[in-house]
């Protein structure tokens, strides 16, 4: 989704991550059809996950389970991340796939810390909070996620400002709610 939005805005990017099965093939095809660059690692087993959002009063979500990421695949990802250069922007988005450590976002930000790579993190809960010590350039909690972090209800702009400010105090350079 990030690469599609950037492409629509005329910004060149490369979609990077893991794909598997017919869903992974379709993801690659759709991105390339829209002119997006891809550098996915294709896994030999499993199927890329599909997330379904149902428009209803309760906003039901159905999140399928994706493929298991092997240590070998993780090392391949890290090698690709090592190719990033000063001034590049890395977006880490979503939940952690099966097989990766719960600290993977922290590990990646730590690995890139000295290289002046701008990082954007779109994640929830501890996955988001645990990267703050690495001073990501931008984090993007929605107002529900922001409230969950601080165990409060965010129901007006004043609370958004207060609690987004608290995330900045904890290390985020910019917070987009």
Which residues are covered by each model-predicted region?
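Conserved phosphate/ATP/ADP-binding segment of small-molecule kinases
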Residues: 106-119, 123-177
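Short acidic/histidine-rich motifs immediately flanking catalytic phosphotransfer sites
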Residues: 84-89, 135
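Active-site core of PLP-dependent enzymes with the aminotransferase class I/II
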Residues: 99-107
């Amino acid at each position: 989704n990030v690469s599609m939005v950037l492409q629509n805005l005329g910004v060149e990017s490369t979609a990077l991550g893991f794909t598997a099965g017919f869903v992974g093939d379709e993801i690659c095809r759709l991105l390339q059809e829209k002119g997006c660059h891809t550098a996915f690692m294709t896994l030999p087993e499993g199927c890329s996950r599909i997330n379904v959002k149902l428009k209803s009063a309760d906003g039901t979500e159905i999140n399928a389970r994706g493929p298991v990421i092997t240590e070998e695949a993780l090392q391949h990802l890290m090698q690709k991340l090592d190719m990033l250069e000063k001034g590049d922007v890395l977006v880490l988005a979503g939940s952690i796939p099966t097989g990766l450590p719960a600290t993977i976002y922290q590990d990646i930000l730590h690995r890139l810390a000295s290289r002046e790579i701008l990082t954007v993190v779109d994640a929830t809960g501890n996955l988001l909070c645990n990267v703050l010590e690495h001073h990501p350039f931008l984090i993007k909690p929605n107002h529900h996620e922001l409230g969950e972090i601080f165990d409060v209800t965010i129901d007006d702009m004043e609370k958004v400002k207060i609690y987004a400010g608290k995330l900045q105090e904890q290390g985020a350079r910019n917070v987009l709610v």
